[in-house]
Amino acid sequence: MTKLRGIAASDGIATAKAYMLVQPDLSFSKSTISDSEKEINRLHKALQDSTSDLETIRKIAAESLGEEEAQVFDAHMMILADPEFTGAIEGKINDDKVNAEQALKEVADLFVATFESMTNNAYMQERAADIKDVTKRVLSHLLGVTLPNPALIDEEVIVIAHDLTPSDTAQLNGKFVKAFVTDVGGRTSHSAIMARSLEIPAIVGTETVTQDVKAGDLLIVDGINGDVVLDPTDADIAEYDVKAQAFADQKAEWEKLKNEKSVTKDGKTFTVAANIGTPKDLAGVLENGSEAIGLYRTEFLYMDSAELPSEDDQFEAYKSVLEGMDGKPVVVRTMDIGGDKKLPYLPLPEEMNPFLGYRAIRISLDRDDIFRTQLRALLRASNYGKLRIMFPMIATVAEFRQAKGILEDEKAKLIAAGQTVSDDLQVGMMVEIPASAVLANQFAKEVDFFSIGTNDLIQYTMAADRMNERVSYLYQPYNPAILRLIKNVIDASHKEGKWTGMCGEAAGDSIMAPLLVGMGLDEFSMSATSVLRVRSLMKRLDTTELTDLVETAVNVNTSNEENQKLVEDFMKDR
C-alpha cells in the first residue's frame, strides 16, 4: 500500500477515480494596438462577463455553503468595480498602446507585488490572492479560454489540484465530488473550511499529489487521518470500505443525539451551539440539534446591502432568528466591519495594517449613529427570544463601558417612548485580543459573559497570519501559551459567577474539545455540521480525569505537536 500524507482538513473516507483540475494555458503575446477605444471596449466586456460569472458563483456558494463563505466573492466583485484598478488598466492601454491582456497583467502584477511586499499585513496578503484569482478570470474572457468548471462534473470523482480557489471550491457538487486533495493549504484555508461546510472528505498540503497522480487513477482518500492511498489493491479497498462504513455508522449514531443534552460521562452539562451569518443559516442550526446560537455575525446584514441597513430591516432579521430558535439563547455580535470586511458605501481609511486598525468596536464607538441604530434594532428584537449581545475587538475596560453605556442609553430611550425591552438581556464581549485575555479578571467584573474568538486570539498571540503559508506553522491552537490564555479567561469568569463560550474554529476541534471541557468552558459554538460530533465526543469524557490532562497541556515546552499527541493518546481508550 502506497500512501501520500497530507493535512486532514475534512472528515470522511472516499474511493473514486482522480479528476485533475488543471488550470488552462493563459499565455499571450504583448502587442501594439492602434485603436485604444476598441481595446478598452474589449476590456469592459471581459470585466462585465467576469462579474456575471462571480454573481453566479456567489449564488451557488450562498446556497451550498452559507453567506459567510460566499462573502469572499463580494471582495472579488469589488476589485472588478474598483476605479483605481480598472482605471490603471485603461491608462496603460491609452498611454502605452498595448493590448488589454498586457495592460491587465502589468497592472495586476504591480498591485500583487505591492500587497505581497507587506509580509506583516494579513489583509494585504489576502487581497493579493484575490487579485490573482480575479485577473485569471478576466484574462480567460479576453483570450476566449474557458476556466475549469467543477460544477460540470457529472460522475463520482476525487478532485486533485495544486490548490483550489474559493471559486473552484464553491462550485463543487457534493453529489459527484466525493473528496478533494491539494498540494498546498492548511486546515484553516478557505478550501478546507468550505469542504467541512460541504461535508466532503478533504486532504490539503500534500505537496506532491499533482505529480504523483494522473487523471483516472483510482484513489482512496482518508480525510480522518490525512492519508491518500495510491493505486489501492482490492484488499486496500475492502479495508477502507469497512472504515467508511464505520464512519457512516458513527455519523448515524451522532444523529440520534440531535435532541439530547451535551453531557459528559460524569454528568457535567455543557452547551454546544452553532455559528451563523444570516437568518438563512438557521435551518442548518436546527437540523443539527444545536442548543443555542453562540455567534450571529451581523456584519453580513451590512455587506449584503447597497446601503446601511435600516433599523427596521435589522429588527426583522434579528427577530426572525430569535423566533426561529424558540427560546434558545442567541448571542449576537455587533457589527464587525473593517480588516477584511469593507463596505462600498462606508469608506474606511487606507491603513498599513487594517486588522490592527480602525475596525469592529472602534468603528462603532466612533460612528455611534450606526451603532445606535443597530442597538435599537436589537433591543426591540429582545422581546422575541433569549437575546445576548456582545461587542467585538474589545481591548480595554473603558471601551466596554462606553459601548454598554450607549446600549443603556438607547434602552432608556425606548422604554421612555413606551416600548418594551426584555429584562433577561445579557451583555458580553469577545476575547480575541491578548490584552483582554490577560486582564480577564478585570473584565469579568464588568461583563455578563465572555466569548473567546480563537481565530484572532491565536493570530495575535503568535504574531502569525493563518492564511499565510510561510508562517502558518505558527498558527498553533494547542500551544501552551494559547491554552493558558483560554484557561485564564474561563477561570476569571467563573470566579465572578459569569460564563464563558468559544466561537472560533477551535471550539469544534476534536483535540481542543477535551482540553476545553477539562478547563470548564461553558459553551462551545462552531459550524453547525460539527455539533453532533462534539456532543458525541463529550459523552466519552469524564471531567474528573481531565484535570491532569489540562495541567500537563498548559505546562509543556511550547510544543503544539506534543499537546496534540497528548490528547490523541488520552482519547485512544475512550
UniProtKB/Swiss-Prot annotation:
Mg(2+) binds at E432, D456. The keyword Thylakoid does not apply. InterPro entries: PEP-util_enz_mobile_dom, PEP-utilizing_PTS_enzyme, PEP_util_AS, PEP_util_C, PEP_util_CS, Phosphohistidine_dom_sf, PTS_EI, PTS_EI-like. Its EC number is 2.7.3.9. The active site is at H190 (tele-phosphohistidine intermediate), C503 (proton donor). Its main location: cytoplasm. Phosphoenolpyruvate binds at R297, R333, N455, D456, R466. The keyword Kinase applies. Its cofactor is Mg(2+). Keywords: Cytoplasm, Kinase, Magnesium, Metal-binding, Phosphotransferase system, Sugar transport, Transferase, Transport. GO terms for biological process: phosphoenolpyruvate-dependent sugar phosphotransferase system. General (non sugar-specific) component of the phosphoenolpyruvate-dependent sugar phosphotransferase system (sugar PTS). This major carbohydrate active-transport system catalyzes the phosphorylation of incoming sugar substrates concomitantly with their translocation across the cell membrane. Enzyme I transfers the phosphoryl group from phosphoenolpyruvate (PEP) to the phosphoryl carrier protein (HPr). The N-terminal domain contains the HPr binding site, the central domain the pyrophosphate/phosphate carrier histidine, and the C-terminal domain the pyruvate binding site. Belongs to the PEP-utilizing enzyme family. Homodimer. PANTHER family: PHOSPHOENOLPYRUVATE-PROTEIN PHOSPHOTRANSFERASE. The reaction takes place in three steps, mediated by a phosphocarrier histidine residue located on the surface of the central domain. The two first partial reactions are catalyzed at an active site located on the N-terminal domain, and the third partial reaction is catalyzed at an active site located on the C-terminal domain. For catalytic turnover, the central domain swivels from the concave surface of the N-terminal domain to that of the C-terminal domain. This is Phosphoenolpyruvate-protein phosphotransferase.
